[in-house]
Amino acid sequence: MQFKNVALAASVAALSATASAEGYTPGEPWSTLTPTGSISCGAAEYTTTFGIAVQAITSSKAKRDVISQIGDGQVQATSAAATDSQVQASSTATPTSSEKISSSASKTSSTNATSSSCATPSLKDSSCKNSGTLELTLKDGVLTDAKGRIGSIVANRQFQFDGPPPQAGAIYAAGWSITEDGYLALGDSDVFYQCLSGNFYNLYDQNVAEQCSAIHLEAVSLVDC
């Protein structure tokens, strides 16, 4: 098994939410904040703790560094040390153009992930964990970090952890899965975007700016080193 120099971390704020045109409303149920559709053979449950690593989407499938956590719950990528618990990922590779994207997001299916025709997700890579590593579990399509916070897409399309419940205005708080290839997926898409902001990257579920590049978020096993 190949070890990757990847570290993942996450953090969040706290509020509650419901699905509406404006996103989640505090005090309402949030587990139904899911995208339309699901990816083929995506597993909505993976109870063994895992991390996630940024993988650039290029013709050569080049690997990048893994994600780390800072204090406010945003998922980010950076080459600097994380200090505030937002989720971050360090990266030394030059972001690729969005025109070069090769995505499996269009491969949707209503097939249940537990069907005999679907393989159980296999995590191909491992990473050493440390005090700043983002540790995740997945249950019933809900992504949770080690502090019990909920992985969500908030109003500005950014990926971060909050609550529970998720913060007001959150768009999605469930519908996560792991594909047969070992990638994190949300609804019917396994493509995310890292967008440069100063010396780090914030992570989003959509391409929100020119400085964004398409990525996969690879689920990796975490080990003590």
Swiss-Prot record:
According to the record, the signal peptide region is 1-21
Q: Site positions for Covalent attachment to cell wall glycan, renumbered to this chain?
A: Q74
**Compartment list:** Secreted, Cell wall
Keyword Secreted in the entry? The reply is yes
**UniProt GO MF annotations:** structural constituent of cell wall
- Which Gene Ontology biological process is one annotated for this entry? fungal-type cell wall organization
- Glycosylation site residues: S68, T78, S102, S103, S104, S106, T108, S109, T111, T114, S115, S116
> Which Gene Ontology cellular component terms are annotated?
extracellular region; fungal-type cell wall
Q: Where are the PIR1/2/ repeats?
A: 65-82
Q: Where is the composition biased (Low complexity)?
A: 93-122
This protein's UniProt keywords = Cell wall, Cell wall biogenesis/degradation, Cleavage on pair of basic residues, Glycoprotein, Repeat, Secreted, Signal
- Site (Cleavage): give the residues: R64, D65
What is written about domains in the entry's comments? Answer: The PIR1/2/3 repeat is required for the covalent linkage to the cell wall.
Q: Which family does it belong to?
A: Belongs to the PIR protein family.
- What name goes with this protein? Cell wall mannoprotein CIS3
- Which organism's genome codes for this protein? Saccharomyces cerevisiae (strain YJM789) (Baker's yeast)
